[in-house]
Each structure stands twice: as C-alpha cells, then as structure tokens.
Amino acid sequence: MLGFFNTWLVLAEAIVRRRDFIALLGGAAAIRPLGAHPERPPERILYFTYSAGYRHDVIPLSKVILTRLGSNSGVFEVTATEDTSEFSTENLERYAAVMFYTTGELPMSDAQKRALLNFVRSGRGFLGVHSATDTFYTWPDYLDLVGGYFNGHPWHQSVKIEVVDPGDPLVAFLGNSLQVEDEIYQISDFDYRGSRVLLRLDPSSVDLGKTGVHQRFYGWPLTWTRYYGEGRVFYSALGHEPSVWQDDRYQRILTNAILWSTRRSP
C-alpha cells in the first residue's frame, strides 16, 4: 500500500511540474512584444530593362549591383527581365515593386499597361532610374505615374547636387549636398505639386548658357517621390555612369527607395 502511495506522489509531482511549465510558456507568450510576427520573406522586385531607344551600357552592371544589394539587405530580391509578358495581372501579384531602366515606346499591350497601372495604384511600388523618364512619350498615363519627362542632357560632368530636405529618411545620410559626375538630365512636364523633390541640381555648378539648356523653371529636380493611387513612386535621373552605380551613396539611395516603396522602411 505504501508503494502505491509513493507512486501516486511521483505522478502527482510530475503533473504539477508539467502544469507549471505550461503556465511558464503561456507567460512567455503573453510578454511577446506587441506586433511580433514570424520573419517576413524578402520582397520581390521586378527590374525591367527593355530598351526601345538608346540602350545604356551600364545596364548589365546595374543588374549585378541591384541583385547584390537585395541579397545583402535580406529584405528584397531582384528579378531582372526584358520580357514584357511579365506584365500580366497574375504575374505582377508575385512582386512588391517594379523598377524601370528603359527607353522609348516599350512594346507593351494595352492590357499590360493597365496591369502595371493597377499594380501600382493598388499599393505596390514603382521605381524609375535615369532613362525611365525617356520612356512612353505617347502614353499620357505613364507621365501621371512617373511625374516628368526627359528633356535633354546638356551636361555630362561633375556637378553639385542639393539635398532639398536633409531630414528625409531616404537621403538624410547625404547631408546638405553632394558632388557627382554623371549625365545630367533636364526634366519637362514635371508635376511639381504632386511630387516631393529629394535632390536637385545646383544650377550654379553648370553653364546655363550651354547649347541645349532649357530655362524652364521646374527647380532642376533630379530625384523625387510621389504617389500613384495607393502606390509609392520613386525616380532618380542619376545612373548613366558605371561610377555612379558603384558609388556607395547611390546604392544606399536605391536601397532606401526600394524599402520605402515596399513599405519596409525607411
């Protein structure tokens, strides 16, 4: 009888210990930080580099650098393509943002164009670099998306670039200005009211009397953000020269822009 009683005590103690352990687990769950969630998978970025006009020699390098930036970030991954069939409603659902380094009138069908606009309008991201504004001059909706058109590049030199808002998280690390050597775009048809300019050319650093300079006042914008529906749009006119793509500052701007456009910060 005593042996039975001892066995019962051992079992009872085991049950109590198990209950205490479960309670401890419950307590740990209760104090989990608010908003904690399993690690999110990387955001997928579709990098589209079709050239219907001039093709930039730097495009292969840009693919390598963007792919590496994504891998290093752990937050996004880049798929590069020149295949317009990627622009179907179903396929775009796989991506968080689309980035253009393009020229000319791209061979996209009306359905593909609608799919792109609806994709961004629904809350996804769109990013354009350099000649993305030298694209789709005959499609007015594209101008509404990107915010301006390329209007010549009279300067190919080292210039001073002003940081319009040094407090903006996308460019705060740059300070008040930076010096860059690149092909410098002029922008026409710029939607100044609907855009937030981040970087602008300091006109005192160039010859405004040079042939091809247009004295339209758009504030010499070079990099900006805007919204299209619920979607976030980023554009930078920089990115012609390999040295720009290899510049840590430019890489950080693009990384920040991708994070912003996909709502992963900054």
Go through the PLM ranges and name each one:
Residues M1-V16, A28-A29:
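N-terminal secretory signal peptides
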Residues D20-H37:
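N-terminal export signals
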Residues E39-P42, T49, D57-P60, V64-S73, ...:
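Extracellular ligand-binding/catalytic regions of CAZymes and related secreted enzymes
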Residues Y47, Y54-T135:
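Helical hinge/lid and interdomain linker segments adjacent to catalytic or ligand-binding clefts
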Residues L106-N176:
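A glycine-rich, often tryptophan-bearing local segment used as a flexible ligand/cofactor-contacting loop or short
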Residues G148, H153-G229:
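Catalytic beta-strand/loop cores that center a nucleophilic Ser/Cys/Thr
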